[in-house]
Amino acid sequence: MPAMPLLAEPPEWNAAPEPAPPRAVGQSVLGNTLNLYGARRANLLVIGGVHGDESEGIFLAHLLLAAGCAAPLIPCLNPDGALLRQRWNRRNVDLNRNLPTPDWSAEATNPRYPPGAAPASEPETQAFLAALEAVQPSTILSLHSYKETFIEIERPERELSAGLNAAVLDYAAAAGIERRQSIGYPTPGALGAFGRAKALLVLTYELERGRSHGELQALLQPLRTLIARLDGERFVAP
């Protein structure tokens, strides 16, 4: 697939160790290969690029890949949307409304969030489900961007172990960001609802839109520490 200008390698990437060969878990609508790096059974799966126009999350995911991510990683789940610079996939479906959840509905809550013809109708969603089957994680970290920076965990603190709570709170304090339990509006067919239905812990990391590459690079090392801590402990739903 053509290289995205956004993902041109900064010079310092040249010294990074070459990542292990990826495992293909599917193809996009346009036939782009959807790769899972570091494929193994693990406590954590990291995903970037669910929404193609959220370039900050995609860039940070590729930084993680180049630096060596402690957990299995899909750096860009929606390469077609990234190339087209749009939120949706090539069929104009919001992949974060296309997951098979109890609350999935064919009726969009907003024209911006088209859910697709059926749950998991999109090949990118099917690739994500294949990655889940391969990794068997208990926690998912999804990298997005929004008008402000925060980490959303759709579970109260009491449902997390002391270790997992500490990992998130330490990172939030170090990065100066807020922890939230909800984005504030209904999201049927989204990853949070999927996580609740499947007894998974889902962390959605919203990066402020418009952050420079340098600002995103400054987040890399603290985020690698968070990922190592999340991968070091298995979440058990109450």
What are these regions (language model features)?
Residues M1-N35:
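Short glycine- and acidic-rich boundary segments immediately preceding or forming the N-terminal edge
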Residues Q27-V29, R40-I177, Q181, E208:
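Active-site/substrate-binding loop(s) of hydrolase catalytic cores
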Residues P22, L36, L73, I140, ...:
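Conserved beta-strand scaffold positions in the cores of enzyme catalytic domains, especially
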Residues N35, G52-E56, A61, R85, ...:
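Short, electropositive, low-hydrophobicity segments enriched in small/polar residues
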Residues Y37-R41, R196:
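Active-site beta-strand termini and strand-to-loop segments that position acidic
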Residues I151-E152, G184-P238:
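Active-site-adjacent mobile loop/cap segments within catalytic or ligand-binding domains
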